Amino acid sequence: MLHASFSNAQLTPTFYDNSCPNVSNIVRDIIINELRSDPSIAASILRLHFHDCFVNGCDASILLDNTTSFRTEKDAFGNANSARGFPVVDRIKAAVERACPRTVSCADVLTIAAQQSVNLAGGPSWRVPLGRRDSRQAFLDLANANLPAPSFTLPELKAAFANVGLNRPSDLVALSGGHTFGKNQCRFIMDRLYNFSNTGLPDPTLNTTYLQTLRQQCPRNGNQSVLVDFDLRTPTVFDNKYYVNLKEQKGLIQSDQELFSSPNATDTIPLVRSYADGTQTFFNAFVEAMNRMGNITPLTGTQGEIRLNCRVVNSNSLLHDIVEVVDFVSSM
């Protein structure tokens, strides 16, 4: 079990002010360009950061590909065939490396990218604490154990968040608001629509009109990879409509609606109501929760490394470069 330690003192928003002062602008410009062709990429980048931080802290371990010594977290149940945005992170990292070689970690690149994605989609602007370093391995088993599932009940959600040190109700409710934009696959809601808890009936907490809409998008024998908007009101905008939806029983996945409809929701219902009533209240809570999540067991100082290629640890990256040079020289 991972118990988080928060290290605010080691991370600071000014970390790259001298060594790479334009890093945030570099990241932002690339995301602006990506959004032109893929409006849902902002939500995908935020999700990558979330899934990174929940597994051994925010160390960019989710970005590593398979090696002979470890399996990638990309194969974990919560990531396989759903985590996306890796090529965008590659492009951001390459641009940052051109401007500031061997300076900005992949973990910080992903953290900045998540913040910029939220802001560009209409969400708050804030300076994220920086100074993380990158892990030298991935943690598939930990990803399978730690990542919350769409079918989680509220007690299971609370346990998953507390397990990584996010033990405030506001952590859970505010970070769940990341589902105010983005999409989800039909396969994650089929039980809610047709056979909730093996009853042969839909989830009773699902608004009946919304149920019919979702059944049209996700028919019983249809393609379960079809994508459905998390937020039926403003699907690509980062706002507080997610919470308005929960009040109307229109949360897309079970773990969303649990925040308002679970018998155990006495401490989360008031927060859902508060965020639904005030965008700024939600934004303030979201920024605080994002910074707390961003401070889960960071590698700092001389721990870990600054990866040159976010997909591979440096020894492999350098070996790859050396092999290319040797091949080139031998062909001369």
Swiss-Prot record:
What reactions does this protein catalyze?
2 a phenolic donor + H2O2 = 2 a phenolic radical donor + 2 H2O
This entry carries the following GO cellular component terms, namely:
extracellular region; vacuole
Q: Where is the active site?
A: 51
The enzyme class is oxidoreductase
- InterPro entries given in the database record: Haem_peroxidase, Haem_peroxidase_sf, Peroxidase_pln, Peroxidases_AS, Peroxidases_heam-ligand_BS, Secretory_peroxidase
Q: Where in the cell is it found?
A: Secreted; Vacuole
Q: Where does Ca(2+) 1 bind?
A: 52, 55, 57, 59, 61
**Disulfide bond annotation, renumbered to this chain:** 20-100, 53-58, 106-310, 186-218
Name assigned to this protein: Peroxidase C1C
Which lineage?
Eukaryota, Viridiplantae, Streptophyta, Embryophyta, Tracheophyta
